[in-house]
Amino acid sequence: MKKISRSVSVSMLVLSVVLAALASAPLMAQDWSMFGADTTNASNNGSSISNSNVSRLAVKWTVTTGGDVSARAAVVANVAYFPDWGGNIWAVDTKTGQVIWSHKLSDYGLPAGTVSRTSPAVQGDKIYLGTQKGAWLLAIKANKGDLVWMTQLETQDPYAIVTTSPAVQGNVVYTGVASQAEGASLFGADLSTAVARGSVVAVSANKGAIQWKTYTVPTGYTGGGVWGSNPVVDPSRNTVYVGTGDNYSHPQLGAPSSKPGVTFQDCILKDTEANCLSPDDHVDSILALDMSSGALKWSRRMVTWNQIYAMNGSDDWNVDCLYGLSQCPSNPGPDYDFGSAPNEITYKDSRGKSHTIIGAGQKSGIYYALDPDTGATLWQTQAGPGSSLGGMEWGSASDGQRIYVAIANYYGLPSAAGSAGSWAALDPATGAILWQVADPNGASDIAPMSVANGVVYAGSLSQNATAPTMLALDATTGHALWNFAPGVSVNAGATIVNDTVYWGSGYSNLGLGTGGNHTFYAFSVGGN
């Protein structure tokens, strides 16, 4: 038998102890360079702020903006970058709160009134963000705010928008396109002639040239918008992961249906799935795309044929349905979008073995965990009630120990957490709900979650001016550790870097919340 020297054995033992310690150690603090902190879209970072001192958070400084701030800030090299609903983009010194530069988006040649609600992505000397009008993607010099290039990602749909925050990997920017045609009558769109199709787009980071573009629905269909958080980009798998929204409308059916001219709703009552659902209608789905070409690797549609049949329709839905306006489909669906891209989550099982899942929360209230290579469902959990303004919307977070989700429940449907919004933590291995707490304001919760060093940060849509709409929760128990009342609703996610929490306030889009204080906050322990 070959002998191993005692010194080698001791060295291996020491190495194993060190590796075990590193595996269980908190994430090291680093920059937060895009919506979800990085291309895993996990919204997780290290921080010196913990559950033992977060109760002493106080305002460090504020910036008066030109509008509500619902985009999560990117913070890189001691500069915070964020847009506001007044059409401005800001760069702020994180040490002092002094504005380094700010520009109107219209200064770059875009129409007056153009706004961005995307979190900037920062790489090197550039920041990247999308627009709420015209579906433009911009590259801007980080130091002075000068325009480098801008590219229109969709030219066929006059209502096209970019609300997906960009992700940058290597020399490519990845983002999604949605459409305000879903607002139909509210925005003057005629869905009978609309060409609104969601897409995922890859753009050269240096030049702005479109490298590939993949539509989520076929020609003749509308919808499939890609509209929340930032895409997951996994170079090890050469894969981009996104979530999609519902159809706004279906065409009258020709091929492959045997009944040309039959409406979609009639077809599903009388025909088969193969004849009624286009295999390329990737709505309410999680998609895996090839990073290099945009080719579809797999798609998982999470509204099933049986659900569609039970609805006597499809998941055709638009904003007209909220107000009983004329372009709402006769049999509207439930509007079960994936309002954000997935999270790529790596966790350790009880034996210490690492596993990676693609997790995504849907407006149905279900959070799904999928195999990243095949799309197979590993587990699914009903975390709260679903509706057109329910379930999970703008983004979840994970530290690898738990997945943190916000439940909107705007309509006050009964649930285990009561008849309002809530926040919950799920086990990444099983989907079991580990804790769930109600919004203390009795409000809806659609803001993206953040987590850092055992503390979860959550925003409330409460319209009560005295309500604490910024909250910090214990990641292990969900117990409230800190709160702050900015006087308005909060739909921005918190950004946590080192010893500071950066947070925008105000949200009045579609009348869902309140705004008007025009303030961006930095918090630190003791305000120091």
Model-based region annotation:
Residues 58-60, 98-102, 146-150, 211-212, ...:
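A structural motif specific to WD40 beta-propellers
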Residues 31-39, 66-90, 111-137, 158-200, ...:
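Repeat-blade elements of multi-bladed beta-propeller folds
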Residues 418-484:
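Generic long, charged, amphipathic alpha-helical segments
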Residues 93-96, 141-144, 204-207, 291-293, ...:
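Short loop/turn segments that connect beta-strands within beta-propeller blades
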Residues 29-59:
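Blade/loop signatures of beta-propeller domains
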Residues 104-111, 152-157, 210-222, 296-333, ...:
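Surface-exposed loop and turn segments in beta-propeller and other repeat-based domains
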Residues 11-24:
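Bacterial N-terminal signal peptides
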